[in-house]
Amino acid sequence: MSNKKDIAVKISGGKKIREAREKVKSDTLYNLTNAVERLKSASYVKFDPTLEIVMKLGIDSRHSDQMVRGVVNLPAGTGKTVRVAVICKEEREEEAKSAGADLVGSTNIIDEIKAGKINFDVCIATPDVMAAIGSVARILGPKGLMPNPKLGTVTLDIKNAIKNAKSGQVEYRAEKAGIIHAGLGKLSFSDQDLLKNLNAFIEAVIKAKPAGLKGSYLKAMYLSSTMGASVQIDLTSIA
């Protein structure tokens, strides 16, 4: 009896996937509004998926003058709970705690990192402790957690840095082949909020275009949801 039920569930699940995929046409280009609507209607998973963006840039990320990297404060947030660690001198620890940091300290946090215990999503540091943090740069760097003044995570303004991290600040960085990938909120967000996040992110990446770049900068753009369909964006619809 249980086998029949399992088969019925699998058939039902497969049907939902097929029906969802039929709502998105692989040979069609969508504007942002239509893309969000399609992805919502095509989602079949039982959890709240993330809206993801992939941008293909006409850069060669092997050249230092063509690096595209930065942060964006998403107007509607990410929908995720962000754990923030602040590494600073003892006299500023209380300030960091009051501002909402989840982990605060100096050598204690660095020792935990060395031991492989990384229980945070963002690491913020004051300039006066960066020399000490250098000892774990090879651990934090590959994970995208190394504090960086260009990203606002090496700063004297601890309070504002924590606020930005908690409220929906997203880092972007062009990887090999000029690909940028980021999550921009939950599919349960209103269409308006998702579009606000999308427009803010796209605008930031476009503004980050390397000054000396020749040729087309934005080559292709795709939106998708976690375990869901993917749609290609009509670049002529991007203002």
Swiss-Prot record:
GO terms for molecular function: rRNA binding; structural constituent of ribosome; tRNA binding. GO terms for cellular component: large ribosomal subunit. The keyword rRNA-binding applies. Keywords: Repressor, Ribonucleoprotein, Ribosomal protein, RNA-binding, rRNA-binding, Translation regulation, tRNA-binding. PROSITE patterns: RIBOSOMAL_L1 (PS01199). The keyword Cytoplasm does not apply. GO terms for biological process: regulation of translation; translation. InterPro entries: Ribosom_uL1_bac-type, Ribosomal_uL1, Ribosomal_uL1-like, Ribosomal_uL1/biogenesis, Ribosomal_uL1_3-a/b-sand, Ribosomal_uL1_CS. It comes from the Bacteria. Disulfide bonds: none annotated. Binds directly to 23S rRNA. The L1 stalk is quite mobile in the ribosome, and is involved in E site tRNA release. Protein L1 is also a translational repressor protein, it controls the translation of the L11 operon by binding to its mRNA. Part of the 50S ribosomal subunit. HAMAP family: Ribosomal_uL1_B (MF_01318_B). Belongs to the universal ribosomal protein uL1 family. This is Large ribosomal subunit protein uL1. It comes from Rickettsia rickettsii (strain Sheila Smith).
